[in-house]
Amino acid sequence: MAPARGRLPPALWVVTAAAAAATCVSAARGEVNLLDTSTIHGDWGWLTYPAHGWDSINEVDESFQPIHTYQVCNVMSPNQNNWLRTSWVPRDGARRVYAEIKFTLRDCNSMPGVLGTCKETFNLYYLESDRDLGASTQESQFLKIDTIAADESFTGADLGVRRLKLNTEVRSVGPLSKRGFYLAFQDIGACLAILSLRIYYKKCPAMVRNLAAFSEAVTGADSSSLVEVRGQCVRHSEERDTPKMYCSAEGEWLVPIGKCVCSAGYEERRDACVACELGFYKSAPGDQLCARCPPHSHSAAPAAQACHCDLSYYRAALDPPSSACTRPPSAPVNLISSVNGTSVTLEWAPPLDPGGRSDITYNAVCRRCPWALSRCEACGSGTRFVPQQTSLVQASLLVANLLAHMNYSFWIEAVNGVSDLSPEPRRAAVVNITTNQAAPSQVVVIRQERAGQTSVSLLWQEPEQPNGIILEYEIKYYEKDKEMQSYSTLKAVTTRATVSGLKPGTRYVFQVRARTSAGCGRFSQAMEVETGKPRPRYDTRTIVWICLTLITGLVVLLLLLICKKRHCGYSKAFQDSDEEKMHYQNGQAPPPVFLPLHHPPGKLPEPQFYAEPHTYEEPGRAGRSFTREIEASRIHIEKIIGSGDSGEVCYGRLRVPGQRDVPVAIKALKAGYTERQRRDFLSEASIMGQFDHPNIIRLEGVVTRGRLAMIVTEYMENGSLDTFLRTHDGQFTIMQLVGMLRGVGAGMRYLSDLGYVHRDLAARNVLVDSNLVCKVSDFGLSRVLEDDPDAAYTTTGGKIPIRWTAPEAIAFRTFSSASDVWSFGVVMWEVLAYGERPYWNMTNRDVISSVEEGYRLPAPMGCPHALHQLMLDCWHKDRAQRPRFSQIVSVLDALIRSPESLRATATVSRCPPPAFVRSCFDLRGGSGGGGGLTVGDWLDSIRMGRYRDHFAAGGYSSLGMVLRMNAQDVRALGITLMGHQKKILGSIQTMRAQLTSTQGPRRHL
């Protein structure tokens, strides 16, 4: 068929392009072809428009293989618009596809006469549809993809030598959303041949990564989008973290996240999990490989998660699967015994075969054999094992409380962590012993059968362990509290006896012990019996005199009570009118009396009488009566926590057999002491030994044997009260501080009831335990007042400052419970001031003169009014007007029960001490200052010297400037601790009050 008008014959160049069609290759890996014309034999079935545009040409290449192309070459005519449309292509789920076009294009310059009409480009279009539209498509429906130009074009010379210049262009199409699409080529005047068209989309291939299988995934709609794909763990594996990968637009897997690990019993091998072989195991999922079974174990099947122990071997419940299987130990060896009376010490060596374990302990089995070793029975609960009978760690044991002349068999078993798993009997070492002769045990039960005026009949039970035939009983008796002077004994052959020849109306103490051929046992507990009183026989005159005497005594007693009630103003404040009671309770009625804070219910101390150790004729008798001797070997000193002139105070532990060590404080007398120093030192222990109260330091015992001299007391973790408060400045509530004072007051009430005068009550002599319980301590020796006006009462342990002592005790050396009350008021001030030194930096001489002139310490910062009023009452000049300790405790109890009464704080209204005013500079001198204290001295006096630089940097060079400071000024100096702010402001407030009242009248209390 002749060529159309304006067209060049295509056969001239189709033949040269035939070889190019054969170069079409299959889709690359990761690419899925939707259309590939190189695989179509014959006509492609595409539509052309108009009819004289594109031509379908079927030729053969040089290999005589058929080849089909679409060609157009209407270069002679202008305004060409020739369309070539593909068949409908299903999308197959792809969001974006790629068109790979292979074509040839002739150079316009190689054709004469076509410069105005020849083009070297063509356009590519696409149209989406959900079905095949047939031939009913319109040009306007298509969307342009791109204008395509050839990288290389051929000329007439190329045709002559059959040289092919093939162009390959790839364009992306999308995003697509409908079921299929068409591609269309628009020719606008080029000499062009389409050799092949491949339409494909990209996908990420299926793969296994990190033991997770990822299925193939189609790329996203955009060239930059990533499609997330979640993997599935391969067989016998489990997720460690969720496995995910991202499929890129180029069909490549990116960014692996998470992974799977092989399950227990399986290990990874070439992207798969394979079972552990026989003899191997894996106990937990993970990356680790299967491990060989530990010693003495095996795996029964592949994929073992644990190895089973061999016969007679075991694994304890807490042993990991990786541990070797072990077995019970063999018996201990070299078991030896050492008999001492009715006790035996057993020692042995560890077993030769520990069974592969190190957790070996020992159990002791005791069997008593009265008749023969073949007929034994359990020893019973009375036998004592030290340290214990089972779970022994050390290879030694003491067995006590055995019967005398008795055969025993002891079995020592060695056990370890798998002994309970073995059905076999435990292996033990055996030793047989016979106890020696021993004295009988203590007589436990003794009771009074009858008591007359001059005789007492007693009845008791035989000892639980007679340890032989009891030959007789010995009864020891004496008048109460006269054992050291004389006592008597009586023999009896039965468990009953009558003691005669006693004094009528006298209290006697009786003790009984048994005797065998081995000796005497211990005496029983003491039992007190009072003999009957004789019947009095009086005549009428005697009876009349007795009645008159009783009546006179009652009258005198009544007068004394009336006198006491009128003169004891403090008692009236508590017992008369409600108006007086409001003085301490802010208008609230006092609460009923309740148990002390530090006593458990129903356990109040029993009243007794204090005995002065120096009144004993024999100095050592007081120590034996009131103290307990402790063996020095039971005390282990760990560190020194204090020292003084007479000795050192140490922290240590007291070993108690069968119990935990007790932490104690040990006061040891220094070497080189005299006998008088030793006697005075131990006299303090004799004093402490008489006290039993939860707010009095408890004496554990003394060490007096040999050259050692030590006093052992309970250990108080927080040390002295003054140091403790200074360390925790501002950290307690008012209620907590009142609770501490209540504890000190309760202890002093107890001492006062006993008739004991402390003479040195101060915060430094009050100790605090871990529960904030305060206990009175330091029961020192006699004190001597020197003639020096600055003197302090001295003891061998040091000086007692004047500022804690009552005026009458300083002036007349008169110490009483009332002088202790004065000291308690100072302790109250110390507690509320958090360990502040009373009277600051005043000398002892100034303190004495100021107190005599009526000065009293002002209320500390934030001190409730009720507490400061109680201090002032304790500092009453007339000691008869001071409260008793029982009344002080009642006031503190009332304040604790009525917290609202502690809200009103006291204001500083007392006059300053004249000595203090004289020692200071003229505060009214402004910033110029005077000739006395500096700002640094003032800060040192209130223990705030650390802030010297702060005040200097703030420009406060004199106390005159300091007096004008407020809370904001103090904070501006960088003082952030609330307790320190309160202390500084409180001192400033005190100085202001002292300044304003310096010229005012003084009054005595």
Curated annotation (Swiss-Prot):
Family from the record: Belongs to the protein kinase superfamily. Tyr protein kinase family. Ephrin receptor subfamily.
Binding site for ATP: I641, G642, S643, G644, D645, S646, G647, E648, V649, K667
Localisation: Cell membrane; Cell projection; Early endosome membrane
Domain SAM, residue spans: 930-994
Protein name (record): Ephrin type-A receptor 8
Gene source species: Homo sapiens
Origin superkingdom: Eukaryota
Glycosylation site list: N340, N407, N432
Record membrane topology: Single-pass type I membrane protein
Annotated signal sequence range: 1-27
Free-text function comment from the UniProt entry: Receptor tyrosine kinase which binds promiscuously GPI-anchored ephrin-A family ligands residing on adjacent cells, leading to contact-dependent bidirectional signaling into neighboring cells. The signaling pathway downstream of the receptor is referred to as forward signaling while the signaling pathway downstream of the ephrin ligand is referred to as reverse signaling. The GPI-anchored ephrin-A EFNA2, EFNA3, and EFNA5 are able to activate EPHA8 through phosphorylation. With EFNA5 may regulate integrin-mediated cell adhesion and migration on fibronectin substrate but also neurite outgrowth.
Residue span(s) of domain Eph LBD: 31-209
Domain Protein kinase: residue ranges: 635-896
EC number annotated for this UniProt entry: 2.7.10.1
